[in-house]
Regions:
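PP2C/PPM-type serine/threonine phosphatase catalytic domain
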Residues: 1-382
Length: 382
């Protein structure tokens, strides 16, 4: 999740010193992530944080408008039709047992995270994505959507959208937007006029169409009377042979990270639409700008109240093996500069170089650094 310049960021909940659940009016909340808990719970079902025994009576659950959204909830696509998603069978993260239809493990009884909290994608062996709610938040407002041809290095589409935390239903809207953009870019294969320049121009137009399509999907998933219209970032990349085409709105990013033994330098391809980037452009050091006041406030976004959702686009020719990475700030918060991400990926890939385990390892690493935000990671191997 990210912030919008036009809105105040949601206050972060601070942990109680003794590890007990905090009270907010009549409700109990986890001291670690702020999710609602019940008296007597041994641990938070959202972030697994241990809780001290509570003397208070159980409190009502979250209202429907604030409750975490299952990935099995129907999404409204831009043509007004419903797009149903099917639950994925998964083992219990605690004991490996079977998770029942009620969401609880049939062996140990632990409630499993819902599908929207953590999911992975792998349409081809050389492309993968992982999306996770992190540790500090009780809902995942990041979304990934990817597509690829089966032949390694042929063509891949990576999309990441990061829902704005202060807007309503951004978890649903970001997923709808990411999928809509992915579907358009998978289907759209412009050839231009047979020259590299014309192909780059045609792909730039495709990126703009993808952002517009994603914007329609976000609006379609926004309640007409909502005072805080759903909104999200947009970052997409297409890897086709030795060419990368990319576009972004907001502060989700696209990186090209060649292998360590390559003479080619790692590079952040996209440029953020954010307060931090504006300060960097004025000469403020990156570390200071990205950790200063309103650093993650974005200046462009997708959504009904967006004044400008036309993406910045670009292209790059790559030479040699490496990784195309599209990610939300939940990852780059902890490794912003391209060389740092290049070294991190090299270290994690040494244990398992396959894209899916690597994407999962990047998410795990971000959580180990604090997991203060949702995390969206999409990878393609070149």
């Amino acid at each position: 999740m990210t912030e919008q310049t036009a809105q105040e960021p949601r206050p972060a909940s601070e942990p109680a010193a003794d590890g007990t659940a905090e009270t907010n009016g009549a409700s109990l909340r986890c001291p670690n992530c702020g999710a609602p808990v019940e008296a007597g719970d041994a641990f938070c079902e959202s972030c697994r944080h241990p809780l001290s025994p509570q003397a208070e009576a159980p409190v009502p659950e979250l209202s429907d408008s604030a409750a975490p959204i299952e990935i099995t909830r129907s999404l409204v696509v831009s043509d007004g039709q419903d797009e149903d998603t099917v639950p994925i069978s998964r083992p219990c993260p605690n004991c490996g047992g079977v998770v029942g239809a009620d969401g609880y493990c049939e062996i140990c009884g632990m409630k499993a995270p819902n599908e929207r909290d953590h999911y992975t994608e792998q349409p081809a062996a050389w492309v993968a994505a992982c999306c996770d709610k992190g540790i500090r938040h009780y809902r995942n407002e990041d979304a990934t959507a990817i597509g690829a041809d089966l032949e390694p290095g042929s063509r891949a589409v990576l999309v990441v959208c990061d829902g704005v935390s202060t807007s309503s239903d951004s978890d649903v809207a970001s997923l709808a937007g990411a999928r809509a953009a992915r579907d358009l870019l998978v289907a759209s294969r412009p050839a231009g006029l047979g020259t590299p320049a014309s192909l780059t121009s045609a792909m730039a137009q495709a990126m703009k169409q993808a952002a517009a399509t994603a914007n329609k999907a976000v609006i379609a998933n926004t309640a007409p009377d909502s005072e805080n219209a759903a909104s999200c970032t947009f970052s997409a990349a297409v890897l086709e042979g030795d060419q990368i085409y990319f576009g972004n709105v907001g502060d989700s990013r696209t990186y090209w990270l060649p292998d360590l033994d390559s003479a080619e330098p790692p590079v952040q391809l996209s440029v953020d639409d954010s307060v931090a980037q504006a300060r960097i452009s004025m000469g403020v050091p990156r570390d200071e700008a990205e950790n200063g006041p309103q650093a993650h406030a974005i200046t462009k976004w997708l959504g009904r109240d967006s004044p400008d959702f036309v993406p910045m686009t670009g292209a790059r020719t790559v030479d040699g093996p490496g990784w195309l990475l599209v990610c939300s700030d939940g990852l780059w918060n902890y490794a912003s500069e391209a060389p740092a991400l290049q070294s991190l990926i090299a270290e994690l890939a040494a244990a398992d170089p396959d894209p899916l385990p690597l994407a999962v390892s990047l998410v795990k690493w971000a959580n180990e650094q604090g997991g203060k935000d949702n995390i969206g990671v999409a990878l393609a191997r070149h």
